[in-house]
Amino acid sequence: MKQDRLRNFSIIAHIDHGKSTLADKLILATSAIPEREMKEQVLDNMDLERERGITIKAQTVRLKHHAKDGQNYIFNMIDTPGHVDFTYEVSRSLAACEGVLLVVDATQGIQAQTIANLNLALQHNLAIIPVINKIDLPSADPDFIKEQLEDVLQIESSNAVLVSAKEGIGIDELMEAVVRQIPSPTGNTSEKLQALLFDAWYDAYRGVMVLVKIQQGSLKVGEEIMMMATGNRFIVEELGTFNPKQEKCAQLQVGEVGYLVANIKQLDQTKVGDTITHSTNPCEKPLPGYKEAKPMVFSGLYPISGEDYEDLRDALKKLTLNDASFSYEAETSTALGFGFRCGFLGLLHMEIVRERIEREYKVDLLTTAPTVIYKIITTDGKTLMIDNPSKLKEQKNIDHLEEPYVLGTIIVPEEYIGVVMALVRDRRGIQKKMEYLNPQTVLLQYELPFNEIVLDFYDRLKSGTKGYASFDYEFIDFRTSNLVKLDVLLNGELVDALSLIAHKDKVYYQGRDLAKK
């Protein structure tokens, strides 16, 4: 396929705005899967993803489209995680694209996640096609959404495509918009190989499978490759594309998206965002944007029955095969027995792992309260990171503690401003911005300690606004805070698993609430 006939794009949207349904309809419209074989949300493989209506891992599918200009095109549609916990994964998937379909619900309008995802797309200088979905609903107001696109997002609304993914309305027009408005990939086949690794997972039969986008050069079966972040070298055994079923090919050329198999035994030998090049004739420098995905939320997982300890360990080991951002280490509690200290990208990530263990491995769990990672600055200027409050007593010569802060964006109906402000004030929030998106809807931005939102902030926000508020956040930095360690005694005995780090002004109330439980 000629390079100028390739279109690589992603669909980004707030949760429940119809991203997966739209992906399904595009697959149907290009006859990639016969309708009788189609199941809803074909790109969402994991049962949990389908059930929750979210995408956890990036998926990709290659679609053929015969356009009105008489030419045949290849669409590489890269489905991305839509949740804040997986922001880095989203950014790497977007780096494999030249454009995005920005889906907005015609009945709900712009939400916090819409803005967060758009900002990621703008950082990658991607072409943006606004897609106003659910126009078949009686409460749909496409003209109002167009105003929002221009006023709030500063996006030209004249090229917005009106669709109903559920009813299949506007799908042909959308595919023509992809041809016209999303540029073909740049790059040169004669250059040294530069391939972006944007996802990887473990296959029981073939080892680790890697999703790549060829940014420069080309890649053939039998060639030796090198991972630039780790220096690991492998021989390419198989290349292919998802159509959406796996289809082998002899090579991947510049601009193409596909998978590779290279006898990679462990997932941690691959890093999402890494650059793959030839080992014998490597490129001069890696692609920009790579960083290690680090756990931000930590919790203890203990089997309710001590007999399940080995099963839990096996379950955690298997989960890390497909999730390199998840970490665990054995720990012992005097009250809870043997368990594991686990690290997650965020609260949703933690919930998904816990649910998978209980559902797939049949282990009933007791989960300790989630905590964030803290920074200790010692009197001699050293910096230490701790993820477990019980480790604080081991540290000597502490000068001060620092905690992570996030920038939170809340979009809420005007009548609930007071409720939101009271909640955020209680969580030590600092207001940075307040903007009316229209007379009825307000955007609020706050700097908040991450520790204040990991427990029940989202639930309290939703219940206080009758479900109308949307919330998103991004990590900013670590800041010095007046933090203390709270220990819990049960019948005079210290229960280390219940220890927590809290702000001095709130430690009494948190201790009282714990005692009530």
Give a label for each model feature:
Residues 1-517:
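Structural and coupling elements of P-loop NTPases
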